[in-house]
């Protein structure tokens, strides 16, 4: 590495030790210690919130174009250090070279520039009053930042999800207290380093590290005005309950139905399923968690998927030709093993490709899966492809909608009318037609229904969530005779 790995907390512009000591971060592929990272406590969170509160008025008063210039500078510095950040992603969370570079180059770094561009377009409205029969009133709708926003992000896209959230939150004039996942603190600190180097004032971005208690301290703090969280549905529900009247945006679990109808391009659908199920070893909220394949093409699809999975190169994520690396932690591994073995016990046929060693879990295809199995009802978050045979479109829709989750779905068909009707019928925030479930666009709204979250993120939808609308009413005070509502019976 060109520089020593950053391991401290960032509070009010200074890199500081955590009051709780340190905690270790280990490589998922080798188990080797990468670094000991600052362990924060509720006191550190309080100091971070205090710093964010003190910095927020000045940051909000900073001319918009000056804030945007800093966003652009963050992007430029991030792009310059992109390969360095990508290499840490490989070591810290086990992404392959291609996956790490894609996260940093295609998503994380550009997010800062895109947020700066978007905030320039976040305009208000001016309109006349409709409540009086004079021309005295002018109404102006503006946006003001919420204030201090708590940001809690996961390990699977640590620089991407955080950059998208923080860039929009900060560009809008808010300040932030950020708790990255304890499984990805180092690459997140690199993002914070870039922000400070680019000229972000002290206190605008604060970073605290630790376990769930640190996140809870952010959520519980009375001086935190809004909350952003990406992670599990269970944790999201607890955050929503504590958020109460505070604005919050939650992106939670997914049920990932991939529906392959009888008229689908089978080869394309197989490639889509490979990406949906095995990209970053399935540790993606938009992963294909269940494949609903029509009986007419089921056998051909399964045969081709198995042939393709058998070619998957699994191993050291630091090698350029590796296509799938390890799971990030033992909890994820335990859930994957539990779901697969329960399905096996209930009659599913299991085919696996690759070794199960340490946190490496083989690419796994399950046939004979039924909708009642846990692996078909819950988010597994691993490299699994559970296949359910369907006989009709209504059956596919019913199974896809049977989950309480509804983040994203993938539908494969050649018929436009079918795509339109099924797309409308699926109760998911996004339906990708003839595209992997892992596709999303930074300028389109992203979010789910049901237990998959609250609100929509990306682009203008982020700015709407983390600003408040404010109405200014002007009486121009001219000499026109005012309309007398009482005299006319209006009141």
Stretches with model-predicted labels:
Residues 33-40, 55-61, 150-151, 258-261, ...:
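Short, well-ordered beta-strand elements within core beta-sheets of diverse protein domains
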Residues 127-268, 390:
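Rossmann-like NAD(P) dinucleotide-binding subdomain of oxidoreductase/dehydrogenase enzymes
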